[in-house]
């Protein structure tokens, strides 16, 4: 029998950590209340996030929202909010989501102080962060200690199986989704059973599938116009289904702890290239969409030229690394070029264009015209170099094109190669 209490004990903050967080939170709230009152600001500080809900794991952050009256214009609200954030976090740095906010540390605890507008259930939001205090209220009102521990178990399970985290780089399940799922199904075990039997998309409530098209549809209990599961990828939904099936077949504690994965290097008989460039100093949520876009463009170029791409991988640290695996990286001297169907109005024009240029043809196969022509660009390296000059790889990456390197893999030490050869169900 699996010992959930032991697992929770390994991940749940102890009394000392909880007391320290409470003292820090109380101190921040008091200082904010004092300065808000002294400056006659129509706002109030609110503790949100997993700590305030009682669903946090060890080493959690503190999220303090300053909720403003809607009488303040957006620019003024943000300006006041940032000044209050810097008042609390003297060495804090400004970060940007939909609203700018201040992030820093107090006694080695990460603190985010976020300005937002105060809204009531059903009211129109100005930005997505405005819902967050309502999320906190919803979870507190709909959970008891047992459910909160089951929420923790689900978070632990998802983290260990690499499907937790709503950031763009992960595209997994957020903490709020874990809370909604456990509240909906009443226990951790019921959530796992649901995933193990799920066919197709996840849709809660079941009649919401037509309204939203994403793989995971979980209507936000505080805002029926929002799909809280929109960020979850089909791959991570699939991974969670498999993890749940495997867990129910063999219930053991290993499903709640990170697995050590070692690369399994082997000869593949393919051609592997690494495209590298320096990472710009911008946040993950901005850089990752550009890297994913660049990866897709490289793959599509390889396919269009006929290098027969097999797979790809990315890794983003201090450098951006994109791996592309090809069945071949050099093309033959002759390429077969497809023309229009013979029934097309363009068929005669195609013949006239190619009759004196083709190495062979034009000729017909079934109902289409073809020619054999000389391959102009034969190597993947040359093709990608040519295409890079005109490729749009995103606002921030475009500025770094001159620093892009294209390297043919030959047992070189790249993080993306380790990641590629470590790939399994959960990685």
Curated annotation (Swiss-Prot):
What GO biological process terms are annotated to this protein in UniProt?
RNA repair; tRNA 3'-terminal CCA addition
Residues involved in CTP binding: 50, 53, 135, 155, 164
Residues binding Mg(2+) are 61, 63, 112
Reaction catalysed by this enzyme: a tRNA precursor + 2 CTP + ATP = a tRNA with a 3' CCA end + 3 diphosphate; a tRNA with a 3' CCA end + 2 CTP + ATP = a tRNA with a 3' CCACCA end + 3 diphosphate
Q: What class of enzyme is it?
A: transferase
Keywords assigned by UniProt, alphabetized: ATP-binding, Magnesium, Metal-binding, Nucleotide-binding, Nucleotidyltransferase, RNA repair, RNA-binding, Transferase, tRNA processing
Residues at which ATP binds:
50, 53, 135, 155, 164
Superkingdom to which the source organism belongs: Archaea
Q: Which cofactor does this sequence's record say it needs?
A: Mg(2+)
One Pfam family in the UniProt entry: CAA_C
EC annotation?
A: 2.7.7.72
- Molecular functions per Gene Ontology: ATP binding; CCA tRNA nucleotidyltransferase activity; magnesium ion binding; tRNA binding
- Record-linked HAMAP family: CCA_arch
Subunit structure, as described in the record: Homodimer.
| Family note | Belongs to the tRNA nucleotidyltransferase/poly(A) polymerase family. Archaeal CCA-adding enzyme subfamily.
What is the protein's known function?
Catalyzes the addition and repair of the essential 3'-terminal CCA sequence in tRNAs without using a nucleic acid template. Adds these three nucleotides in the order of C, C, and A to the tRNA nucleotide-73, using CTP and ATP as substrates and producing inorganic pyrophosphate. tRNA 3'-terminal CCA addition is required both for tRNA processing and repair. Also involved in tRNA surveillance by mediating tandem CCA addition to generate a CCACCA at the 3' terminus of unstable tRNAs. While stable tRNAs receive only 3'-terminal CCA, unstable tRNAs are marked with CCACCA and rapidly degraded.
Task: Share any extra remarks.
Answer: A single active site specifically recognizes both ATP and CTP and is responsible for their addition.
Identification of the protein by name: CCA-adding enzyme
Q: What gene is this protein a product of? A: cca
């Amino acid at each position: 029998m699996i010992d959930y209490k032991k697992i929770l004990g390994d991940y749940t903050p102890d009394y000392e950590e909880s007391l320290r967080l409470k003292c820090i939170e109380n101190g921040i709230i008091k200082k904010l209340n004092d300065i808000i009152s002294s400056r006659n600001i129509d706002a109030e500080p609110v503790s949100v996030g997993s700590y305030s809900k009682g669903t946090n794991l060890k080493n959690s952050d503190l999220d303090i929202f300053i909720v403003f009256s809607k009488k303040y214009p957006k620019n003024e609200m943000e300006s006041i909010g940032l000044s209050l954030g810097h008042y609390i976090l003297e060495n804090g740095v400004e970060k940007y989501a939909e609203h700018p906010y201040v992030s820093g540390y107090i006694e080695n605890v990460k603190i985010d102080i976020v300005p937002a507008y105060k809204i009531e259930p059903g009211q129109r939001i100005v930005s997505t962060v405005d819902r967050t205090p309502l999320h906190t209220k919803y979870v507190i009102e709909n959970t008891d200690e047992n459910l909160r521990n089951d929420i923790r178990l689900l978070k632990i399970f998802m983290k260990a199986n690499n499907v937790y985290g709503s950031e763009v780089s992960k595209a997994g399940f957020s903490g709020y989704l874990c809370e909604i799922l456990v509240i909906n199904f009443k226990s951790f075990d019921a959530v796992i059973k649901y995933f193990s039997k799920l066919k197709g998309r996840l849709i809660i409530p079941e009649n919401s599938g037509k309204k939203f098209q994403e793989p995971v549809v979980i209507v936000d209990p505080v805002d029926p116009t929002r799909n809280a599961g929109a960020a979850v990828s089909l791959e991570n939904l699939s991974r969670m289904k498999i993890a749940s099936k495997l867990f129910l077949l063999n219930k053991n504690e290993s499903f709640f702890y990170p697995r050590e994965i070692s690369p399994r290097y082997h000869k593949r008989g393919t051609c592997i290239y690494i495209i590298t460039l320096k990472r710009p100093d911008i946040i993950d949520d901005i850089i990752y969409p550009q890297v994913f876009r660049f990866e897709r463009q490289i793959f599509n170029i390889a396919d269009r030229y006929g290098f027969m791409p097999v797979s790809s991988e990315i890794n983003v640290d201090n450098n951006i690394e994109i791996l592309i695996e090809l069945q071949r990286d050099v093309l033959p001297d002759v390429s077969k070029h497809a023309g229009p169907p013979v029934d097309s109005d363009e068929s005669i024009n195609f013949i006239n264009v190619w009759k004196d240029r083709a190495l062979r043809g034009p000729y017909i196969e079934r109902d289409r015209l073809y020619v054999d022509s000389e391959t102009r660009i034969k190597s993947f390296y040359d093709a990608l170099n040519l295409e890079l000059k005109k490729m749009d790889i995103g606002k921030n990456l475009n500025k770094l094109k001159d620093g892009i390197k294209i390297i043919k893999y030959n047992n070189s030490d790249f993080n993306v190669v380790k990641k590629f050869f470590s790939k399994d169900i959960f990685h």
